[in-house]
Regions:
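SAM-dependent transferase fold signal centered on methyltransferase-like domains
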Residues: 1-213
Protein backbone atom coordinates (compact mmCIF):
# COMPACT_ATOMS: atom_id res chain seq x y z
CA UNK A 1 0.00 0.00 0.00
CA UNK A 2 1.08 3.56 -0.69
CA UNK A 3 1.65 5.80 2.33
CA UNK A 4 0.54 8.58 1.96
CA UNK A 5 -2.23 7.10 -0.18
CA UNK A 6 -2.16 7.00 -3.97
CA UNK A 7 -4.87 9.66 -4.40
CA UNK A 8 -2.85 12.15 -2.31
CA UNK A 9 0.28 11.56 -4.37
CA UNK A 10 -1.59 11.81 -7.67
CA UNK A 11 -3.12 15.12 -6.61
CA UNK A 12 0.32 16.41 -5.60
CA UNK A 13 1.73 15.66 -9.05
CA UNK A 14 -1.10 17.70 -10.62
CA UNK A 15 -1.05 20.70 -8.29
CA UNK A 16 2.55 21.26 -7.14
CA UNK A 17 5.03 23.23 -9.23
CA UNK A 18 7.49 20.37 -9.30
CA UNK A 19 9.13 17.73 -7.18
CA UNK A 20 9.76 14.04 -6.69
CA UNK A 21 8.05 11.24 -4.77
CA UNK A 22 10.14 8.29 -3.69
CA UNK A 23 8.38 4.92 -3.93
CA UNK A 24 9.49 1.29 -3.79
CA UNK A 25 10.95 -0.07 -7.04
CA UNK A 26 8.53 -3.01 -6.93
CA UNK A 27 5.49 -0.70 -6.67
CA UNK A 28 2.73 -0.99 -9.26
CA UNK A 29 3.37 2.43 -10.74
CA UNK A 30 2.44 1.76 -14.38
CA UNK A 31 -0.20 4.24 -15.57
CA UNK A 32 -0.60 5.55 -12.02
CA UNK A 33 1.20 8.87 -12.62
CA UNK A 34 0.32 10.26 -16.08
CA UNK A 35 2.45 13.18 -17.24
CA UNK A 36 5.27 12.26 -14.87
CA UNK A 37 8.70 10.73 -15.34
CA UNK A 38 9.44 7.59 -13.31
CA UNK A 39 13.11 6.98 -12.58
CA UNK A 40 14.39 3.55 -11.55
CA UNK A 41 17.74 3.61 -9.75
CA UNK A 42 20.06 0.67 -9.18
CA UNK A 43 23.09 0.49 -6.89
CA UNK A 44 25.75 -2.17 -7.40
CA UNK A 45 23.40 -4.27 -9.53
CA UNK A 46 20.32 -4.07 -7.31
CA UNK A 47 17.28 -1.91 -8.10
CA UNK A 48 16.94 0.11 -4.91
CA UNK A 49 14.64 3.04 -5.61
CA UNK A 50 11.94 4.51 -7.84
CA UNK A 51 11.21 8.23 -7.97
CA UNK A 52 8.18 9.87 -9.57
CA UNK A 53 9.32 13.21 -10.96
CA UNK A 54 6.53 15.69 -11.71
CA UNK A 55 5.99 19.25 -12.87
CA UNK A 56 9.16 21.24 -13.51
CA UNK A 57 11.32 18.34 -12.27
CA UNK A 58 10.01 15.81 -14.79
CA UNK A 59 11.92 15.04 -17.95
CA UNK A 60 10.36 14.83 -21.41
CA UNK A 61 9.93 11.03 -21.34
CA UNK A 62 7.90 8.61 -19.25
CA UNK A 63 10.74 6.51 -17.83
CA UNK A 64 14.36 6.88 -16.81
CA UNK A 65 16.91 4.30 -15.66
CA UNK A 66 19.99 5.27 -13.68
CA UNK A 67 22.81 2.98 -12.61
CA UNK A 68 25.06 3.80 -9.64
CA UNK A 69 27.88 4.27 -8.87
CA UNK A 70 28.60 4.68 -12.62
CA UNK A 71 26.08 7.51 -12.87
CA UNK A 72 24.89 6.55 -16.36
CA UNK A 73 21.28 7.48 -17.06
CA UNK A 74 18.84 6.80 -19.91
CA UNK A 75 15.47 8.50 -20.41
CA UNK A 76 13.01 7.52 -23.14
CA UNK A 77 9.59 6.11 -23.97
CA UNK A 78 9.81 2.28 -23.59
CA UNK A 79 7.70 1.79 -26.73
CA UNK A 80 10.04 3.82 -28.92
CA UNK A 81 12.30 0.84 -29.71
CA UNK A 82 12.05 -2.86 -30.43
CA UNK A 83 15.19 -4.99 -30.46
CA UNK A 84 15.61 -7.77 -33.00
CA UNK A 85 16.29 -11.33 -31.92
CA UNK A 86 19.05 -13.53 -33.29
CA UNK A 87 18.78 -17.24 -34.20
CA UNK A 88 22.20 -17.90 -32.64
CA UNK A 89 24.25 -16.26 -29.92
CA UNK A 90 27.16 -14.00 -30.78
CA UNK A 91 30.57 -13.83 -29.07
CA UNK A 92 29.28 -12.20 -25.88
CA UNK A 93 26.23 -12.46 -23.66
CA UNK A 94 25.04 -9.45 -21.66
CA UNK A 95 22.99 -9.42 -18.46
CA UNK A 96 21.08 -6.11 -18.25
CA UNK A 97 21.00 -3.99 -15.11
CA UNK A 98 17.73 -4.35 -13.15
CA UNK A 99 16.95 -0.63 -13.45
CA UNK A 100 16.87 -0.99 -17.24
CA UNK A 101 14.63 -4.05 -17.03
CA UNK A 102 12.23 -2.58 -14.43
CA UNK A 103 11.90 0.70 -16.34
CA UNK A 104 10.99 -1.10 -19.56
CA UNK A 105 13.91 0.52 -21.37
CA UNK A 106 15.70 -2.71 -22.28
CA UNK A 107 14.95 -2.42 -26.00
CA UNK A 108 15.92 1.26 -26.06
CA UNK A 109 19.27 0.55 -24.41
CA UNK A 110 19.90 -2.49 -26.62
CA UNK A 111 19.12 -0.60 -29.82
CA UNK A 112 21.45 2.26 -28.90
CA UNK A 113 24.28 -0.18 -28.16
CA UNK A 114 23.74 -2.49 -31.17
CA UNK A 115 22.72 -5.45 -29.00
CA UNK A 116 20.32 -8.25 -29.94
CA UNK A 117 17.91 -10.29 -27.86
CA UNK A 118 18.55 -14.01 -27.51
CA UNK A 119 14.78 -14.49 -27.53
CA UNK A 120 11.74 -12.21 -27.66
CA UNK A 121 10.80 -13.27 -24.11
CA UNK A 122 14.35 -13.21 -22.73
CA UNK A 123 16.17 -10.24 -21.19
CA UNK A 124 19.65 -11.57 -21.95
CA UNK A 125 21.32 -9.82 -24.89
CA UNK A 126 24.14 -10.71 -27.25
CA UNK A 127 26.64 -9.09 -29.64
CA UNK A 128 30.11 -9.59 -31.10
CA UNK A 129 31.46 -6.44 -29.44
CA UNK A 130 31.31 -5.19 -25.85
CA UNK A 131 29.47 -1.85 -25.61
CA UNK A 132 30.71 1.01 -23.47
CA UNK A 133 27.74 1.14 -21.11
CA UNK A 134 27.27 0.42 -17.43
CA UNK A 135 23.79 -0.94 -18.13
CA UNK A 136 25.05 -4.46 -18.88
CA UNK A 137 27.39 -7.04 -17.38
CA UNK A 138 29.42 -8.82 -20.05
CA UNK A 139 30.23 -12.52 -20.38
CA UNK A 140 32.45 -14.18 -23.01
CA UNK A 141 30.61 -17.17 -24.42
CA UNK A 142 32.56 -20.43 -24.41
CA UNK A 143 29.80 -22.80 -25.52
CA UNK A 144 26.03 -23.01 -25.99
CA UNK A 145 24.51 -26.36 -25.01
CA UNK A 146 20.99 -27.74 -24.97
CA UNK A 147 18.96 -27.31 -21.79
CA UNK A 148 20.34 -30.51 -20.26
CA UNK A 149 22.31 -30.65 -17.03
CA UNK A 150 23.53 -34.09 -18.10
CA UNK A 151 25.05 -32.61 -21.26
CA UNK A 152 26.51 -29.75 -19.22
CA UNK A 153 28.20 -32.14 -16.79
CA UNK A 154 29.64 -34.17 -19.67
CA UNK A 155 31.02 -30.99 -21.28
CA UNK A 156 32.61 -29.72 -18.07
CA UNK A 157 34.31 -33.02 -17.23
CA UNK A 158 36.85 -32.27 -19.97
CA UNK A 159 38.17 -29.27 -18.01
CA UNK A 160 36.28 -28.68 -14.75
CA UNK A 161 36.41 -25.29 -13.04
CA UNK A 162 37.26 -24.31 -9.47
CA UNK A 163 33.90 -22.58 -9.06
CA UNK A 164 30.65 -22.01 -10.97
CA UNK A 165 28.26 -19.08 -10.89
CA UNK A 166 24.78 -20.16 -12.02
CA UNK A 167 22.36 -17.57 -13.44
CA UNK A 168 18.89 -17.61 -14.97
CA UNK A 169 15.99 -15.30 -15.81
CA UNK A 170 13.16 -16.93 -17.79
CA UNK A 171 14.13 -20.55 -17.16
CA UNK A 172 13.32 -21.62 -13.61
CA UNK A 173 16.10 -23.61 -11.93
CA UNK A 174 17.52 -24.16 -8.46
CA UNK A 175 20.99 -22.67 -8.83
CA UNK A 176 22.47 -24.33 -5.74
CA UNK A 177 21.20 -27.75 -6.79
CA UNK A 178 22.71 -27.37 -10.26
CA UNK A 179 26.01 -26.07 -8.89
CA UNK A 180 26.44 -29.06 -6.57
CA UNK A 181 26.11 -31.43 -9.52
CA UNK A 182 28.93 -29.89 -11.55
CA UNK A 183 32.45 -31.37 -11.56
CA UNK A 184 35.17 -29.23 -9.98
CA UNK A 185 38.83 -28.96 -10.89
CA UNK A 186 41.65 -26.51 -11.50
CA UNK A 187 40.27 -24.41 -14.38
CA UNK A 188 39.29 -20.74 -13.85
CA UNK A 189 35.73 -19.99 -12.67
CA UNK A 190 32.91 -20.19 -15.19
CA UNK A 191 29.41 -18.75 -15.37
CA UNK A 192 26.58 -21.12 -16.28
CA UNK A 193 23.61 -19.23 -17.73
CA UNK A 194 20.23 -20.86 -18.36
CA UNK A 195 18.49 -18.85 -21.08
CA UNK A 196 16.04 -19.00 -23.94
CA UNK A 197 17.79 -18.85 -27.32
CA UNK A 198 15.58 -18.53 -30.40
CA UNK A 199 12.60 -20.08 -28.63
CA UNK A 200 14.43 -22.99 -27.03
CA UNK A 201 15.93 -23.49 -23.61
CA UNK A 202 19.73 -23.50 -23.61
CA UNK A 203 22.70 -23.50 -21.27
CA UNK A 204 25.41 -20.95 -21.99
CA UNK A 205 28.87 -21.66 -20.60
CA UNK A 206 30.67 -18.35 -20.22
CA UNK A 207 33.34 -16.32 -18.46
CA UNK A 208 32.61 -13.09 -16.58
CA UNK A 209 34.43 -10.07 -17.99
CA UNK A 210 35.42 -7.53 -15.36
CA UNK A 211 35.82 -3.83 -16.07
CA UNK A 212 34.11 -4.07 -19.46
CA UNK A 213 31.59 -1.26 -19.08
Amino acid sequence: LYQPNLEWMQKLTRTATGGGIKIGPASNFLQKFPGCEIELISLHGECREATVWFGSMAGPHTFRATVLPAGESLSEDPLSAWTNTTPTSCAYLFDPDPAIVRSGLLDVMAERNNLLRLDAEEEYLTADQIPTTAFVTAFKIEAVLSNSVKELKHYLRQSPSQHYEVKCRRISIEADVVRRQLPTGAEPPRVIIFAKVAGRGAIVVAHRITGAS
